[in-house]
């Protein structure tokens, strides 16, 4: 059976993947992966899809915002098959939605706990500063500079970790899973949320940092005449 993969944006932009390929530049990393996809398409009839327009648009914007040249854009358009997932016909078991709602509730509660801890920490710090400085204006300035800023930064990181880790938090994430389910394809991503729910849906998952090596291994076993074995 012909191999099919559905790519998340992270399939082309993942830092760990570039490190494994020993490439520092993001655009060159994207080029290297797209070259492997092109060779696999020509020699092995492996097809790599991206949901349209969600992930396709993300890839275009990511490439342009990071200064990638027009050749990278052309490679995206040429070697990645654009397809809109059939959101009406793809059937997902109801227990998946039930579990997802429960999981989201748990994450929201964890996020609330992080927020409460940040508020308590800020209050304690403010009171300790206020007890040492009588000038209200100085208290406000010192609080903003020494307390609120660092705590808000720490709070944001903790909140993202508590609330977003392991969830599907964007339309492109959902589109990737729906399209993979529709095509009976494997998902390629470095997003734990996509991985977790791919497993729930019975969709094969390929980590982004192993995908290029997988393609290289396929190509290494391609007969020298360029044909593929069936």
Swiss-Prot record:
Domain of life of the native organism: Archaea
Catalysis: reaction(s): Endonucleolytic cleavage of RNA, removing 5'-extranucleotides from tRNA precursor
E.C. numbers: 3.1.26.5
Coiled-coil portions: none
Keyword entries, A-Z: Endonuclease, Hydrolase, Nuclease, tRNA processing
GO biological process, one term: tRNA 5'-leader removal
GO molecular function: ribonuclease P activity
Group of enzyme by EC: hydrolase
InterPro entries: RNA_free_RNase_P
UniProt family annotation: Belongs to the HARP family.
Functional note: RNA-free RNase P that catalyzes the removal of the 5'-leader sequence from pre-tRNA to produce the mature 5'-terminus.
Name of this protein: RNA-free ribonuclease P
Organism, as annotated: Methanococcoides burtonii (strain DSM 6242 / NBRC 107633 / OCM 468 / ACE-M)
């Amino acid at each position: 059976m012909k191999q099919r993969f559905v790519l998340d944006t992270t399939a082309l932009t993942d830092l760990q993947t570039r490190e494994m390929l020993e490439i520092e530049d993001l655009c060159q990393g994207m080029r290297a992966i797209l070259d492997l996809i092109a060779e696999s398409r020509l020699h092995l009839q492996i097809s790599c899809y991206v949901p349209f327009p969600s992930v396709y648009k993300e890839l275009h914007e990511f490439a342009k915002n990071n200064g990638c040249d027009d050749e990278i854009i052309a490679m995206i358009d040429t070697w990645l098959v654009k397809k809109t997932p059939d959101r009406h016909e793809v059937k997902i078991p109801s227990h998946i939605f039930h579990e997802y709602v429960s999981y989201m509730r748990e994450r929201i509660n964890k996020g609330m706990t992080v927020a409460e801890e940040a508020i308590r920490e800020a209050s304690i710090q403010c009171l300790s500063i206020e007890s040492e400085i009588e000038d209200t204006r100085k208290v406000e300035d010192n609080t903003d500079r020494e307390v609120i800023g660092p705590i808000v930064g720490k709070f944001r990181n903790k909140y993202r970790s508590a609330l977003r880790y392991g969830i599907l938090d964007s339309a492109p994430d959902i589109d990737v899973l729906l399209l993979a389910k529709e095509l009976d394809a494997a998902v390629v991503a470095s997003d734990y949320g996509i991985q977790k729910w791919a497993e729930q849906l019975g969709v094969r998952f390929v980590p982004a940092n192993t995908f290029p090596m997988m393609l290289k291994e396929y190509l290494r076993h391609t007969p020298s005449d360029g044909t593929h074995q069936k």
